[in-house]
């Protein structure tokens, strides 16, 4: 990768200025072509056609602005609010944003590409919203941190629902955002309470009413998503906030990383005593061994006490080829469930 020095950056082409200049140049070229066409028609000896063009243009003396197209107001925002949003996402260490493009977040997409140079996050174009969430789902399980998925209005969020539910059931943090554009081209793609579509299977949702509120909400969403039990979160982003010019950007709030819950020392000592005194103990992992360190410690405990460990199929909590993997033999007289939902294969009448 080419290293960008100060001198290189100084002479680099700013993407937004280039696009702005190209648009202005294209408009000027179009006006020039129009003038040349009118001149050619006038020289060809067709005064009637020339007079019609002059009158349609509405010039005060019939000759001013002959042949020029009506002026179209350009919409250019130098510092949109979406630039601040990208800076916040970068502070959250969101590497990728998977999305099926939509008009309700074109401001944010433009800022990702031009303000953020398509890095942190990098915009990944997907053919379907369900694919976007599925990519973020798998990324979180491998990388150990959330990835962003971005949707367009009601239609995009509805397309994503099955994949969101899968992540919710699997307890995987997916950082999601959906665009809401009340003045957009299709009003049917909006809703008064857009997040209601998925509220029953996301951990938290919020629609910021200002950029300052967005900064706080973005940080809180990340903290809640990564706090066990982990789950997807959703932010509803108003298109007007994305595109509104910003004179002074709010400060980016600090991220408060969650601390994983753990048992107190007295409870740990009691569990150790019960395991040592038991004749045929067993451990049910559930989804508790979340990291490689957790797996290594669980293997060390199992080998120390020579007890079987019953993992689950949807997540690696214990090596599948380890001799102690499984339910063991006979009926256990003690079962240690590492989380409440880990009582697999047990009934109220089975041992404690």
Predicted features by range, described:
Residues 2-11, 20-34, 39-352:
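N-terminal alpha/beta PP-like core and its mobile active-site loop of ThDP/TPP-dependent enzymes
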């Amino acid at each position: 990768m080419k290293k960008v020095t100060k001198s290189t950056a100084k002479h680099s082409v700013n993407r937004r200025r280039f696009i702005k200049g190209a648009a202005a140049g294209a408009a000027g070229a179009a006006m020039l072509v129009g003038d040349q066409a009118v001149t050619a028609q006038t020289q060809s000896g067709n005064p009637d056609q020339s007079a019609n063009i002059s009158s349609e243009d509405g010039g005060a003396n019939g000759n001013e602005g002959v042949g020029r197209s009506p002026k179209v107001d350009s919409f250019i925002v130098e510092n949109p609010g979406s630039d601040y949003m990208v800076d916040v996402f970068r502070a959250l260490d969101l590497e990728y944003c998977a999305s099926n493009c939509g008009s309700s977040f074109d401001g944010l997409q433009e800022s990702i590409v031009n303000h953020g140079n398509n890095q942190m996050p990098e915009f990944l174009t997907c053919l379907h919203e369900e694919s976007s969430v599925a990519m973020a789902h798998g990324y979180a399980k491998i990388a150990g941190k959330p990835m962003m998925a971005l949707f367009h209005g009601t239609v995009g969020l509805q397309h994503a629902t099955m994949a969101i539910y899968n992540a919710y059931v699997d307890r995987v943090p997916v950082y999601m955002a959906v665009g809401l554009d009340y003045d957009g081209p299709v009003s049917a793609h909006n809703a008064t309470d857009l997040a209601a579509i998925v509220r029953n299977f996301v951990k938290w949702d919020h629609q910021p009413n200002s950029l300052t509120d967005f900064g706080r909400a973005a940080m809180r969403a990340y903290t809640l998503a990564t706090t066990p039990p982990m789950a997807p979160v959703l932010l509803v982003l108003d298109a007007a906030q994305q595109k509104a010019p910003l004179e002074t950007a709010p400060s980016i709030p600090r991220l408060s990383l969650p601390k994983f819950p753990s048992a107190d020392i007295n409870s740990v000592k009691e569990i150790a005593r019960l395991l040592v005194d038991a004749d045929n103990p067993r451990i049910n992992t559930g989804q508790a061994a979340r990291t490689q360190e957790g797996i290594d410690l669980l293997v060390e405990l199992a080998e120390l006490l020579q007890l079987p460990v019953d993992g689950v199929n949807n997540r690696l909590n214990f090596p599948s080829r380890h001799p102690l993997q499984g339910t063991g033999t006979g009926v256990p007289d003690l079962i240690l469930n590492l989380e409440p939902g880990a009582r697999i294969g047990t009934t109220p009448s089975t041992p404690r």
